[in-house]
């Protein structure tokens, strides 16, 4: 996993090129990520940077977290995230900050977030199943899934069968999004297109693995 940044989805807007072409962009506010811990192969079994972002009221931070942040000498953030290190990322110190300038030379990014929760949904919405006949004698099974198995053999429903159930509210990554602009002054990343999650949700931005 490449080094990245934790940010917050602000919303969508559009920007214009010099030719007047409109580009739809998602605005991600990535305030400086503070390094809370540096994990190493010797002590933790793997190399990684643990970072925090944002702020949290002191009264809302439990003792374990407060001690962890105090040891690192960083202000308590709204959470902790890790980025695995491969060895070629350079030297880092606890308490240092990672900013949007990490992406100055990057053109494509992968954005990970938690998708919007949709609650309990049927097969048509959740899995794009085809609907059955609206008329011609069908009076009860318009959005029903149909058969879910075979016969006496195998005599069971296989695990993973697509059915109605809870939809959304899961970790989703959108790959190869174009990074249109880096605004270091306001700690903003402008990414072309949509990214997973609701406005205000935490997102992780990393250089694209397939770029």
UniProtKB/Swiss-Prot annotation:
Family classification: Belongs to the universal ribosomal protein uL3 family.
Protein name: Large ribosomal subunit protein uL3
Alphabetized GO MF terms: rRNA binding; structural constituent of ribosome
Presence of the UniProt keyword ATP-binding in the record: no
GO terms for cellular component: cytosolic large ribosomal subunit
Domain of life: Bacteria
N5-methylglutamine PTM positions: 152
Annotated stretches, region: Disordered: 135-155
Primary role: One of the primary rRNA binding proteins, it binds directly near the 3'-end of the 23S rRNA, where it nucleates assembly of the 50S subunit.
Subunit structure: Part of the 50S ribosomal subunit. Forms a cluster with proteins L14 and L19.
SUPFAM superfamilies assigned: Translation proteins
GO biological process: translation
The keyword Ribonucleoprotein is assigned to this record: yes
NCBIfam families given in the database record: L3_bact (TIGR03625)
Post-translational modification summary for this protein: Methylated by PrmB.
UniProt keywords, alphabetically: Methylation, Ribonucleoprotein, Ribosomal protein, RNA-binding, rRNA-binding
């Amino acid at each position: 996993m490449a080094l990245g940044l934790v940010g917050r989805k602000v919303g969508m807007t559009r920007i214009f090129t010099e030719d007047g072409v409109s580009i739809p962009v998602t605005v991600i506010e990535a305030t400086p990520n503070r390094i809370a811990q540096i994990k190493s192969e010797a002590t933790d079994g793997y190399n990684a940077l643990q970072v925090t972002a944002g702020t949290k009221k002191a009264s809302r931070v439990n003792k374990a977290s407060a001690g962890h942040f105090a040891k690192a000498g960083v202000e308590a953030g709204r959470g902790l995230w890790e980025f695995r290190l491969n060895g070629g990322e350079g030297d880092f110190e606890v308490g240092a900050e990672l900013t949007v300038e990490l992406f100055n030379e990057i053109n494509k990014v992968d954005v990970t977030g938690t998708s919007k929760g949709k609650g309990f949904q049927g097969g048509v919405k959740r899995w794009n199943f085809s609907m059955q006949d609206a008329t011609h004698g069908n009076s009860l099974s318009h959005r029903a899934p149909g058969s879910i198995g075979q016969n006496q053999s195998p005599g069971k429903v296989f695990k993973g069968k697509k059915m109605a159930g809870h939809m959304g509210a899961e970790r989703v990554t959108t790959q190869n999004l174009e990074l249109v602009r880096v605004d270091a002054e306001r700690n903003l990343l402008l990414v072309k297109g949509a990214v997973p999650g609701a406005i205000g949700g935490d997102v992780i931005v990393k250089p694209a693995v397939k770029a």
